[in-house]
A protein has these predicted regions:
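N-terminal positive-inside, membrane-proximal cytosolic segments immediately preceding the first
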Residues: 1-20
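Structural signature of alpha-solenoid helical repeat junctions
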Residues: 37, 42, 62, 78, ...
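Short solvent-exposed coil/turn linkers within tandem alpha-helical repeat scaffolds
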Residues: 74-83, 97, 113-120, 148-157, ...
Length: 207
């Protein structure tokens, strides 16, 4: 069985608390300027209004309303403190709505806005998942490689990204590369709970 693609809900759950904490932290750093206060107020208001869209039972209409709220805040303050967090959450909502190109755009904006390391990794992983969801596996492979740049086995989300790379390589027909990636995972992720999955993928590849 192919290693599973994370669901949109899993992406949201992975960083819900992180986004709120990051937004509040950004406010502490930038609160000394009037423009920053206005930006933070707009972001906080938009995030509050968008909360119903983040729930597991959100309807398409609720999600669309949340997207509008976050986009309006980013349009008004495209580079204020906390913009990366808002853009990341916008990407999640776009992904949930299966608007994959727009989701990538939002996550790329989060990275461009100087997202902190954890949020940056999540945003880059989202770009890869969006390509994968569109079945553009070659692009997904490239995106996973970008997301893995500079990371090691002890870093946040490294395991998910490395296994995502292997999965995308399989789906792209890059059998030799996928085999190498899974072997790398076995050697680097020695305490992973997914070792049997990895071995199963190698066996399926004839390795």
């Amino acid at each position: 069985m192919m290693l599973p693609l994370p669901t949109p809900r899993a992406l949201l759950i992975a960083a819900g608390a992180l986004v709120v904490a990051g937004l509040l932290g950004a406010g502490g750093w930038y609160w000394h300027t009037v423009a920053a206060r206005h930006a933070m107020a707009a972001y906080a208001d938009a995030m509050t209004r968008a909360q119903p869209a983040l729930g597991p039972q959100a309807t398409a209409e609720t999600r669309a309303a949340g997207i509008r709220e976050l986009e309006a805040a980013l349009t008004q303050y495209p580079s204020g403190p906390g913009a990366a967090e808002v853009a990341y959450q916008l990407g999640n909502l776009r992904y949930e709505a299966q608007q994959y190109a727009q989701a990538r755009g939002a996550w790329e904006l989060a990275v461009a806005q100087g997202a902190p390391q954890t949020l940056r990794v999540l945003s880059l992983s989202g770009v890869a998942y969006a390509w994968e969801a569109e079945r553009n596996y070659a692009k997904a492979v490239d995106a996973f490689k970008v997301a893995l740049t500079g990371l090691g086995p002890k870093d946040f989300y490294y395991e998910e990204l490395l296994l995502g790379l292997g999965r995308a390589q399989e789906l792209a027909g890059q059998k030799a590369d996928a085999t190498a990636t899974y072997r790398r995972a076995l050697s680097e992720l020695t305490h992973s709970r997914r070792l049997e999955e990895i071995r199963a993928r190698l066996a399926a590849l004839g390795a």
